[in-house]
């Protein structure tokens, strides 16, 4: 099926995040609602999104209910449908790529909705099969970009954390965790009490239910407390007398390989992110990674993006 000739580079991260969140799961074959015209289908979708009506969205898009339910625990998957509706209310165009297919163009940035409309007989419906792969590819790209951005911010977050001793200690050290243990300030994020200073990760996670969340934009994160021979300065431990003083590093791994991400990422205090495809068992492989060690099997993440110069339809 011919797609409209519209290049949408990864740089348009914010706009893409806003518009992709109403479609966050793999599509499944289920009974779908059809419509007399593409315009009728488009407005039904917008109305369902505006009402945050999961049943209506499932009927229109053909998702099964089990896939829709996954939206609650991950802020990257959570449905911020009000923003989607706002963008569609500003700009909604229907571009017919053939007599039997059409695409929705949404928002001021002319975002091409990933699920096309197709005509069967005299009725139109969203082609969820055609949209599934495109949606997955876009979601993976966005999740990976967001993960790289978080890791690039890690040096600033850790320096902010290290400015003062924490939890009654007289030692200034880096955080050993991303999320603090309940009742402690041993991580980059904690629930700030009334009048208490916000945690370094507070601004980034202000709209996230950190008690329910198990990942962030499809990735899990873990601090690394040592580095290997391939790291600048060679192998050594960052821990001194139980405190993370000699440096810091982190590892990020996709929750579901091939669905929420493909590449795994590492970073240290210099903020340069490296990537590697750990394969379908990324989560198991990652469990044995104890040190920051960007050897020749890892590549610079941003360099790969520049080289590939990816575009989205």
Where do the language-model regions lie?
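N-terminal secretory signal peptides that target proteins for export/translocation
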Residues: 1-9
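Bacterial N-terminal signal peptides
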Residues: 11-25
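Short, low-complexity N-terminal intrinsically disordered segments enriched in polar/charged residues
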Residues: 27-47, 131-156, 160
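Short, well-ordered alpha-helical segments enriched in acidic and aromatic residues
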Residues: 53-65, 171-173, 178
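Surface-exposed, charged secondary-structure patches
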Residues: 65-113, 210-217, 222, 227-230, ...
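Short beta-strand edge/turn micro-motifs at domain boundaries
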Residues: 102-105, 109-145, 152, 272-276
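Flexible, glycine-rich surface segments
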Residues: 161-261
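C-terminal soluble interaction/assembly domains
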Residues: 246-300, 311-312
């Amino acid at each position: 099926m011919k797609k409209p000739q519209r290049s949408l580079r990864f740089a348009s991260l914010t706009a893409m995040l806003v518009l992709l969140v109403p479609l966050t799961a793999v599509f499944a074959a289920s009974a779908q609602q059809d419509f007399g015209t593409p315009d009728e289908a488009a407005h039904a979708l917008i109305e369902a999104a505006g009402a945050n009506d999961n049943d209506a969205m499932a009927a229109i898009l053909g998702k099964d209910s089990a896939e829709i339910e996954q939206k609650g625990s991950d802020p990257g998957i959570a449905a911020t449908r009000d923003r989607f509706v706002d963008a569609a209310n500003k700009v909604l165009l229907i571009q017919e790529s053939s007599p039997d297919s059409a695409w929705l163009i949404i928002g001021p940035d002319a975002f091409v909705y990933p699920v096309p409309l197709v005509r069967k007989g005299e009725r139109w419906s969203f082609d969820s099969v055609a949209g599934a792969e495109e949606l997955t590819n876009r979601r993976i790209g966005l999740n990976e970009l967001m993960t790289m951005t978080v890791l690039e911010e890690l040096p600033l977050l850790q320096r902010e954390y290290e400015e003062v001793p924490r939890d009654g200690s007289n030692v200034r050290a880096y955080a050993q965790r991303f999320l603090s243990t309940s009742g402690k300030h041993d991580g980059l994020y904690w629930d700030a009490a009334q009048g208490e200073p916000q945690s370094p990760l507070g601004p980034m996670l202000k709209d996230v239910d950190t008690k329910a969340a198990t990942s962030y934009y499809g990735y899990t994160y873990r601090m690394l407390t040592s580095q290997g021979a391939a790291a600048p300065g060679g192998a050594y431990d960052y821990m001194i007398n139980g405190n993370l003083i000699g440096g810091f590093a982190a590892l990020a791994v996709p929750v579901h390989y091939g669905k929420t991400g493909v590449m795994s990422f590492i970073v240290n205090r210099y903020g340069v992110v490296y990537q590697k495809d750990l394969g379908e068992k990324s989560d198991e492989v990652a469990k044995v990674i104890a040190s920051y060690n960007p050897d020749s099997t890892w590549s610079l993440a941003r360099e790969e993006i520049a080289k590939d110069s990816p575009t989205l339809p």
